[in-house]
UniProtKB/Swiss-Prot annotation:
Residues 190-513 form the GH18 domain. Optimum temperature is 65 degrees Celsius. Stable up to 50 degrees Celsius. The lineage of its organism: Bacteria, Bacillati, Bacillota, Bacilli, Bacillales. This is Chitinase Chi52. Has a potential application in agriculture field as a biocontrol agent. Optimum pH is 4.5. Has an extremely wide pH stability range (4.0-13.0). It comes from Paenibacillus xylanexedens. Residues 80-101 are annotated as: Disordered. Keywords: Carbohydrate metabolism, Chitin degradation, Glycosidase, Hydrolase, Polysaccharide degradation, Signal. One of its GO terms (molecular function) is carbohydrate binding. One of its GO terms (cellular component) is extracellular region.
Length: 523
């Protein structure tokens, strides 16, 4: 008898058995579950919501940057490798740690904490005041409002995941609100912010310590990349030694002034297109700020530094790498220096209010940055110059350099607006104390947008006190916004060029507003 025929059934059965155990055996190459707080490198595989993703850019995972919503960081590669039937998620996230408070006023407090971890992913956090849920957030920060002056509250935070599992409460944090009488600003409740040139452009050469005492916040301009395409920023004083410049900063700070490092400018293109450049950015800024003792950082990116890639259509979840990396980098710098570190930004109108009608390229490109940093942002002073005309919330176009322009552009940030048209996602308003008006100090300072002191002050009287000047634009909030912070100008040097006419006109005006408005936010 043929031996091959005799043993064929045995061989067939053995082969079938081998195929069965291979099919049902656990896969050795199954991807690990994605977790917030984990450092991933390019090529790492993870599973999230039963789908597999490959890391395409090294980063540390954060809540809100899950693989399914950040294609700039993750590439979908197939259905989940964890098995045919996923195991139900019953494990709660870890307990939030490091709960701290900052920016305590008589009616509000800012809270922050360390990110929790979870076997699948943290979906968000719940904030409790005296044991009662007061707000939920997808980030590790929250602002609790509606508090009473001179009152002590106990705050806790719980983490939750997509399956509904909730962690135990964090360690309780006791916070006592202020009595409302503290001095909030460097010298008053209304600030005058100016940019100081670290270069000579024919305006005026001023030692930093000799800046007019009218200014509350001085933005030293600029830190710039060491070379084209680099993420490493550098700063060297142009008219003083390092020791002299550090002494000048300390001198201004002894007078109650805040001295910030401004990065970028018209010539300082900063494009953080990958994780390496982002790390260079973080490391170099931390070094510069620590060396000189700056009080904070100002973001003054223009041109191609911020531009939306094709297909990046929602400011709430950006996909353009240089925008994603900028957000992560600035958050890291802010976190490194703590709650008292000031963060400001000076975008052009096209990059902010321009997103009202169109979102793409430069139009609205700052909105994802402002949105992601709104809890960290001390002040936003959009440049109301070099812009031409812009459309307000009423659908009408207003020309730069007029009172109507300033009122219309400011109220867009105070009311919020739909992005990219009336059906687009809504950009929520900022707090009034986060807003200042940016204008040129003289006609020589900008290509357009200079506003006379009389026109700027009547715009501010309307915006802050609701005192109408009979213009074409009508405030949606007729009583105004008392908390608006003040005026920013380009620049201190151009102001000095005209014998400080700008600051001499506006400092007394701001002082007058300071005596009429109270209960501002403390920084």
């Amino acid at each position: 008898m043929n031996q091959a025929v005799r043993f064929r059934p045995v061989i067939t059965f053995a082969l079938a058995f081998l195929l069965l155990i291979t099919w049902f055996a656990p896969r050795a190459d199954a991807a690990a579950q994605w977790q917030a707080g984990t450092a991933y490198k390019k090529g790492d595989l993870v599973t999230y919501q039963n789908k597999d993703y490959e890391c395409i850019q090294a980063h540390t995972a954060l809540t809100g940057w899950e693989p399914s919503v950040v294609p700039a960081l993750w590439k979908y590669v197939g259905e989940g490798s964890g098995g045919e039937t996923p195991t139900p998620d019953t494990a709660p996230p870890s307990v939030p740690a490091g709960l701290t408070s900052s920016s305590i006023t008589d009616t509000s407090v800012s809270l922050s904490w360390n990110a929790s971890t979870d076997n699948v992913g943290v979906a968000g956090y719940e904030v409790y005041r005296n044991g009662v849920l007061v707000t939920s957030t997808s980030t590790t920060t929250a602002v609790v409002t509606g508090l009473t002056a001179s009152t002590t509250y106990a705050f806790t935070v719980k983490a939750k995941d997509a399956a509904g599992n909730i962690s135990a409460a964090s360690t309780s944090l006791s916070v006592t609100t202020s009595n409302g009488s503290s001095n909030p600003g460097p010298t008053g409740t209304k600030w005058l912010i100016g940019y100081w040139h670290n270069f000579d452009n024919g305006s005026t050469n001023i030692r930093l310590r000799n800046v007019s005492t009218a200014y509350d916040v001085i933005n030293v301009s600029f830190a710039e990349p060491i070379s084209h395409g680099s993420g490493t920023l550098a700063f060297t004083p142009y008219n003083a030694t390092v020791a002299e410049f550090k002494s000048d900063i300390a001198y201004l700070q002894s007078q109650g002034k805040k001295v910030l490092l401004s990065m970028g400018g018209a010539n300082g293109t900063i494009e953080l297109t990958d994780a390496t450049k982002r790390q260079q950015f973080e490391d170099s800024l931390k070094s510069i700020i620590s060396t000189y003792g700056f009080n904070g950082l100002d973001i003054d990116l223009e041109g191609s530094s911020l531009s939306l890639n094709a297909g990046d259509t929602d400011f709430r979840s950006p996909t353009t790498p240089k925008i994603v990396n900028l957000i992560q980098g600035v958050k890291a710098v802010k976190s490194h220096f703590g709650a008292n570190f000031i963060l400001t930004a000076a975008p052009e109108t096209a990059y902010v209010q321009g997103g009202y009608l169109s979102y793409g390229g430069p139009w609205g490109a700052y909105l994802p940055v402002i949105h992601a940093l709104r809890n960290e942002l001390t002040l936003l002073h959009v440049q109301h110059y070099n812009t031409g005309s812009m459309v307000g919330l009423d659908g009408r176009s207003y020309a730069q350099g007029t009172a109507d322009f300033h009122v219309a552009m400011a109220e867009m940030l105070l009311q919020g607006f739909h992005v990219g048209g009336s059906t687009g996602p809504f950009f929520s308003p900022l707090r009034p104390d986060q807003i200042a008006i940016g204008v040129p100090a003289s006609q020589q300072a900008a290509g357009g947008g200079y506003t006379t002191p009389a026109d700027l002050q009547k715009a501010l009287n309307y915006l802050i006190k609701g005192v109408s000047y009979g213009g074409s634009y009508t405030l949606r909030q007729s009583t105004g916004y008392a908390g608006i912070k003040g005026i920013m100008t380009w620049s201190i040097n151009w102001d000095a060029y005209t014998n400080n006419q700008f600051s001499s006109a506006h400092r007394p005006f701001l002082n007058g507003l300071s005596t009429q408005t109270t209960k501002e936010v403390v920084y």
